[in-house]
Amino acid sequence: MDILETKAKPKKQREASFWQSLKKALRDNFPDWSATRLESRASLGVPDVLIMDSRGAWHMVELKTTANMSVNITPHQVAFLTKHARGSVWIAVKLTSATGHEVFLYRGDRAVDVKLEGLRARPDKHFSNPVNYRAVLQA
């Protein structure tokens, strides 16, 4: 192994895969919706995805992936989601296990609960294996 070689970060790869699944579901089921993946390194805490639905309403979604009950949400993300909780801001967590995938949806005002309790916090919506991403997007 070269000392300058950087290892791929599996968490980001899983999050990118989650984004690809949502993007495909949008394209296949809601062609009149628009979604943009945001690069939030410049603005800490800003959610990962900005979506405009067919009515012109805006939604922001923080994407998270995990292989256990914990959710790695930063204090900046908690602050943003809590501050903007009156709007349509969401945390979408994809749990990957040996038996498949599940998606947990939490409204932004639940960010503190998700930070402290992880997936033990009661979700606003829960989708079991196999995940129907059309239903996730309609939630």
Which residues does each predicted region cover?
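Acidic-basic catalytic patches of nuclease active cores, encompassing PD-(D/E)XK
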Residues: M1-S40, S54, A139
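Beta-rich catalytic cores
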Residues: G45
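Conserved catalytic cores of phosphodiester-cleaving nucleases, focusing on short active-site segments
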Residues: V49-I51, A57-A67
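Mg2+/Mn2+-dependent nuclease catalytic core
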Residues: T66-H84
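Acidic, Ser/Thr-rich peripheral helices and adjacent loops at domain boundaries
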Residues: A111-G118
